[in-house]
Swiss-Prot record:
Pfam family, one: TMA7
Note: Present with 3100 molecules/cell in log phase SD medium.
GO cellular component terms attached to this protein's record: cytoplasm; nucleus
Ranges of Gly residues composition bias in the record: 53-64
Native organism taxonomy: Eukaryota, Fungi, Dikarya, Ascomycota, Saccharomycotina
Ranges where the record places region Disordered: 1-38, 45-64
Subcellular location: Cytoplasm; Nucleus
Name of this chain's protein: Translation machinery-associated protein 7
Amino acid sequence: MSSRQGGKMKPLKQKKKQQQDLDPEDIAFKEKQKADAAAKKALMANMKSGKPLVGGGIKKSGKK
């Protein structure tokens, strides 16, 4: 019997992720991304529920 090795063996322990040094700009950017994602999620939920996106009221035609 022959044994086959199908590529690189996985290590038993995963390497630890290195802690990144974040400056205030990176933190602000990530917060903005989270806020945008939350707003998009709320908008999608509003669209699925069938509610109007904006309160436009009665539509008026240009005719008299």
